[in-house]
Amino acid sequence: MNRWAVPILHEHKHYYIVNKVHGIVCQPPDLRTWYKYHDYEPPVLLDLLRKQHPNFGGEVWRTVHRLDEPVTGGVLVSRNKRAAAMFSRSLALGGNRGFPLTRRYVALLAREAKGLPSEGRITMGDMITDYKRLENDLVLLQLQTGRKHQIRKQMAQVFGQPVVNDKMYGGDSVDGIVDNLIGLHSAFIGAQCGLQARTYLIPIPRTQDAFKLWDKYIDEQGGFIPSVQKELRDFSLPSKLENTITLLSGGQGGIQISYK
């Protein structure tokens, strides 16, 4: 199997849903920094797609959202300039403007995060994320904003439990797992173009390390177990979040968790 294979899971006239393996970057990195830590050319998502799927030449591809190098899972790639602009508008302005895009992740934690509501909304400066604890070590997260390392920072600073194998934010190494893979996966994407809305579940990429890391919650094909799939499809916070916990750390006004 090609180490940097980027399978197209779903096709729509305005976009593709692809499954990113760990190690691939969604935008070209600074090469001087890259070669300090790597002895190979940076595997850039769109470059790999063009090489692996040459029959789609002539389309204008854009990644309208990005995943960090060690994060796996679904990425929506627009197929034309208008779609890219409409998805970007939705991400910037929210609501029903542009083409609305829903992004849900699952995160593996080393231990249970105690003392927090089972579900709620995290506001940390300008970073907003909805969450629900599915198991002691498994959290579902839906981005309301998309800042750099948003989920990784919030798991470490709010939950007090970094994502598994995420040493950048204080996570412990996992024996037998490569360094550039963490327990954070883009597992659900919802996209609405005009009146047409579609949702997609994204399996764990078929690599030995990823399957080992997520073994507890996936089947032999990499799909999540039914209980996790149901939560990914159905997740929604209550319309009124009447209670608030304020944490003193985090700066920029601190951290708030709103919950019912």
UniProtKB/Swiss-Prot annotation:
UniProt-listed Gene3D superfamilies: Pseudouridine synthase (3.30.2350.10)
Keyword Cytoplasm assigned: no
Recorded GO MF terms: 21S rRNA pseudouridine(2819) synthase activity; pseudouridine synthase activity; pseudouridylate synthase activity; RNA binding
Chief location: mitochondrion
Signal peptide: none
Gene Ontology biological process terms, A to Z: enzyme-directed rRNA pseudouridine synthesis
Function: Pseudouridylate synthase responsible for the pseudouridine-2819 formation in mitochondrial 21S rRNA. May modulate the efficiency or the fidelity of the mitochondrial translation machinery.
Family membership: Belongs to the pseudouridine synthase RluA family.
Protein name per its UniProtKB record: 21S rRNA pseudouridine(2819) synthase
Species per Swiss-Prot/TrEMBL record: Eremothecium gossypii (strain ATCC 10895 / CBS 109.51 / FGSC 9923 / NRRL Y-1056) (Yeast)
Origin organism lineage: Eukaryota, Fungi, Dikarya, Ascomycota, Saccharomycotina
